[in-house]
Regions:
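...with weaker cross-activation on analogous glycine-rich loops/strands in unrelated enzymes
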Residues: 30, 104-180
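Low-complexity, Gly/Ser/Thr/Pro-rich intrinsically disordered linker/tail segments
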Residues: 178-221
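N-terminal capping segments
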Residues: 6-108, 146, 213-221
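Solvent-exposed, flexible loop/coil residues
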Residues: 50, 119, 183
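Hydrophobic membrane-insertion alpha-helices, especially the h-region
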Residues: 1-5
Length: 221
């Protein structure tokens, strides 16, 4: 039985080994730090299909000025303001960038792939695995909706939590501010129904495997 058979059924985190839990918490903290820094220190506009973060520079200034002047819809921004291809991100490129800067293996995949790839391919090619229930989600997980993905910063209460994402929606305060944090949102219905929860392999700990192993053992007995 391979690692996929163990990890696809994550259970409630137990106490686990202290070192394992510490490693998890440090990695979660790094992911939050990276995403927060991108939001606070770089001028990133939401650009559909955009894959490059913003920053201080002529092209970024021209992108921002163009967006303010023309006010194109999110999916028309790169077409209306060509300089924005150098200074914008969409939601899936944002989560890829955060994982990369946090030191995680993170090939790009679209939200369509996140929703439709089978667990085996997700694990083999992207080191991601589905988490079956929202009550098992935790900081660092990807919450995938139809056409959108967000990074979970923390659960608050019930089905609510804090998320950070690249967005061209109503939460955006203006050009250059496409990365937004939203607090205490309904995670089950943030952008329509929650379709899938994905967790990077390195965010699993040994305690997550125990319920899966026990369940398999009971079936074999």
């Amino acid at each position: 039985m391979g690692i996929l058979g163990l990890l696809w059924l994550p259970g409630n985190p137990g106490p686990g080994a202290n070192g394992d839990q510490y490693r998890l918490e440090q990695l979660q903290k790094k992911i939050r730090t990276v995403s927060g820094k991108l939001m606070d220190t770089q001028e990133i506009s939401y650009i559909y299909g955009g894959s490059l973060p913003g920053g201080v520079g002529r092209l970024c200034e021209e992108c921002t000025s163009c967006l303010k002047l023309k006010k194109p819809k999110p999916k028309k921004r790169m077409q209306s303001c060509p300089d924005c291809r150098f200074c914008g991100l969409d939601c899936s490129h944002f989560t890829k960038l955060v994982f990369e800067k946090a030191g995680l293996f993170a090939p790009y995949l679209t939200t369509h792939q996140m929703l439709n790839l089978k667990p085996k391919l997700l694990f083999q090619n992207y080191q991601l695995l589905p988490v079956r229930h929202l009550d098992l989600a935790r900081s660092g997980d990807l919450l995938v909706y139809k056409g959108h993905v967000v990074l979970l910063e923390k659960k608050t209460s019930g089905n609510k939590g804090d998320i950070i994402h690249a967005t061209g929606g109503k939460a955006v305060k203006g050009p250059g501010q496409g990365i937004q944090r939203e607090t205490n949102v309904n995670l089950n219905q943030f952008r329509g129904p929650l379709r899938r929860i994905l967790r990077h392999r390195r965010l699993f700990i040994a305690a997550d495997l125990k319920p899966a192993m026990n369940d398999r053992k009971s079936r074999e007995d």
